[in-house]
Amino acid sequence: MKKTLLGSLILLAFAGNVQAAANADTKGTVTFFGKVVENTCQVKTDHKNRSVVLNDVGKNSLKDKGNTAMPTPFTITLQNCNLTAANSSTNKANKVGLYFYSWENADKENNFTLKNKTSTSNDFATMVNIQLMESDGTKEIKVVGKETEDFVHKNATGAGVALTQTHPDNDHISGSTQLTGVTGDLPLHFIAQYYSLGSTTAGKVQSSVDFQIAYE
């Protein structure tokens, strides 16, 4: 009886250790970091919902993957940034820009460009997206989508561990502009262009992206 009881206790202890090890391997912690700042920029009323028309382009200009065509500038203007109140606080931003995102249209497989609309009537072009660029025409804007993964900072190695630096490529703030000395309207300039996924067919092109003011 004693041997049976001892054996049972050993088995229970072993099972407990196995369960503890299993639990350690099947759970974890995600720590989120952020900051609320005093700045209060607003999107100018007539810039909240904009339409940008790209000129028609021949499909031969978009016959190979990665071809771009018809770079078209557009502007989104901010106002009422209230720098006086912000400058009196330690929780102030130095720069402002826009955060472009689309859960539906961001195309992870094609450099986070914007997917063209599709239709059962087959009147939309295929193998073509819309790409957003910074105003210099050289820096691509990667639209944030539901599969964007580069917000995870590799230098935060444990729960509650503060970030020691800001990764320059994963804040996804476009049109970043210094706030110092800004008075009145603050225009932020960007470019939209066609982006080929391969041999583009003729048809309509239409896509959309959401944006929100973001600070640094």
From Swiss-Prot:
- GO cellular component terms listed in the entry, alphabetical order: pilus
- Where does the protein principally reside? other
> Which parts pass through the membrane?
none
**What InterPro entries would the database entry show?**
Adhesion_dom_fimbrial (IPR000259), Adhesion_dom_fimbrial_sf (IPR036937), Adhesion_dom_sf (IPR008966), Bact_Fimbrial_Adh_Pro (IPR050263)
Q: Which Pfam families match?
A: Fimbrial
Q: Which residues form the signal peptide?
A: 1-20
Task: Note the Gene3D superfamilies from the entry.
Answer: Fimbrial-type adhesion domain
Record key words, sorted: Disulfide bond, Fimbrium, Signal
Q: What does the entry give for GO biological process? A: cell adhesion involved in single-species biofilm formation
Disulfide bond sites: 41-81
The record's subcellular location field reads: Fimbrium
Q: What does this protein do?
A: Mediates adherence to oropharyngeal epithelial cells. Helps the airway colonization process.
User: What is stated as this protein's family in its record?
Assistant: Belongs to the fimbrial protein family.
Protein name (Swiss-Prot/TrEMBL): Major fimbrial subunit
Which gene specifies this protein's sequence? Answer: hifA
